[in-house]
Every structure is written in C-alpha cells, then in structure tokens.
Amino acid sequence: MENFQKVEKIGEGTYGVVYKAKNKLTGEVVALKKIRLDTETEGVPSTAIREISLLKELNHPNIVKLLDVIHTENKLYLVFELLHQDLKKFMDASAVTGIPLPLIKSYLFQLLQGLAFCHSHRVLHRDLKPQNLLINAEGSIKLADFGLARAFGVPVRTYTHEVVTLWYRAPEILLGCKYYSTAVDIWSLGCIFAEMVTRRALFPGDSEIDQLFRIFRTLGTPDEVVWPGVTSMPDYKPSFPKWARQDFSKVVPPLDEDGRSLLSQMLHYDPNKRISAKAALAHPFFQDVTKPVPHLRL
C-alpha cells in the first residue's frame, strides 16, 4: 500500500470507500477500492481472494481493468483503472436534454459486448446498475465491479448502511430462485436501457414486494404460460394481484420498433427465453450503431 498515495475520495461503493490514488512508482492514477468485510476479525476469506485473482484475467475494452489486488493485515484493496464518470451522474447531468439516441445505442452495444465476454467466461455480475457503469470522454463505457458479488456476496445494505438498490434486480432473484444464470445481467441492462431512453428508472421499487409489483404492473403478472415453473418458486404467492401487460409503446414511447423489440426480449420473464448478450448484439436495432462522443461536464 505504501506505493499508493491517496489523492481524494471519489465515492462509496457497495463494499467500501473508493479513492483516486497515484502509484508513486509509475505515476499512474488509479481507482483504489478498500473492501470492508464483516469478517475483518478473521481476515479475508481465501475463497474471496481466489475469486478476485481470477478477475485479473478478464481483459476486455468494456470491462474496467482490475490492475492489482493488495492484501495486507486483514484488509483488501483492489486497484482499478480510473474513468471520468459513472452513468448515473451522466444521466443526471443529461436530465433536461436527454442522452442522444446514437449514444444510448453505442453504450448499450458496448455493454452487451462486455457482458458477452464475461458470460462466455462464466462470470456473472449480479449487481449491474448505472453507478457501476463508467464512461470516459472518448465515448467508451465499461462495466465495473464484475465478479465481486460472487467473491463477497450481494449485501442488503452497504458498509454505510445504505440500502442496496433493487431497481435492476431480475424477477427470478426477487422470487427467491437460488440458482440463477447470466440472464440476471441481461434483465438489469434492459432496465438501464429503458432508463437511458425515458430519463427515469423503469421499476423504482422501495422493497422486494414493491419491486415485484412494479414489474408485474408493467409486464403483467407472470403465470405458467409465460414463465413455466414460476408458480413453484420459493417466494411466489397465488394471491399476487393479476395485472395485465402494458403495451411497450406506452412504457418507452421514444423508442422505435427495433428498440422496443430488443427491450422486450431483454425483459422476458422466463430466464431461459431471455435474449443472451451475444444474440442481442446481432439485433437489427444495432444495424446503424456508431461511437459518438459524450458531452461531459467534468
């Protein structure tokens, strides 16, 4: 750790404080994440160290690079490449004008490329949200915190007791499914896609049941026809109200037919029928994809 000089605190992640720091030997400016674990007394679990070490092998232009893992007396620091801003802050700054469609398309395409790469290596994210999608001035967007959920679990609250958001959580997780797949990340990205387009969260729930009911009110309450096996999931209740599905033209009015078609496939209830990242990249929506540069107010 003595090789790094903390410059400033840049945020608070799910697992601990994030600092902008400088490598004293190379002059490289990085993001330094201090991981706070409940097990600080016993030290860092060896399983977590193993999981994290594997992530150093995940090299892709749309994945935030894990440069180093520093494990010193019961503390764990992760050294990542540093990017300008996260998508949440960018969306907030673009709230009045909105993000131009070519940029939304470019971002979604890049994120799907990052997901396809990780999923092909059997690595899930499990906690995708605008806060862990990072952008730079060149028009790139990258997925951050990949694989951390498997190493450390997804807590209910962050280390500062903030509630971890449910807005992007897939229905199979909310219904208590223990064995989930890469499809959970596609669901999250679908929610983020809709949010970029409409400038507001698609399903901003404030509890697990509110989250589920918001999904049901938009996509219709799922049954065995649309989602075989749903009625036998641990947290499914036959008493759930039966809502009808809304037309997607009302859910995401600015989107054209191709965009709505892709979104509906990303938000398919049945995880087995939900589109994969690889298949999504071939969708007609991306026929005219380009790589525009964002107007960043830094």
From Swiss-Prot:
One Pfam family in the UniProt entry: Pkinase
Top EC class of this enzyme: transferase
Catalytic activity entry: L-seryl-[protein] + ATP = O-phospho-L-seryl-[protein] + ADP + H(+); L-threonyl-[protein] + ATP = O-phospho-L-threonyl-[protein] + ADP + H(+)
Modification type N6-acetyllysine: residues: K6
Regulation of activity: Phosphorylation at Thr-14 or Tyr-15 inactivates the enzyme, while phosphorylation at Thr-160 activates it. Stimulated by MYC. Inactivated by CDKN1A (p21).
Binding annotation for Mg(2+): N132, D145
GO BP annotations listed: cell division; DNA repair; G1/S transition of mitotic cell cycle; meiotic cell cycle; protein phosphorylation; regulation of G2/M transition of mitotic cell cycle; regulation of gene expression; signal transduction
Active site: D127
Descriptive protein name: Cyclin-dependent kinase 2
Organism: Mesocricetus auratus (Golden hamster)
High-level lineage: Eukaryota, Metazoa, Chordata, Craniata, Vertebrata
Gene for this chain: CDK2
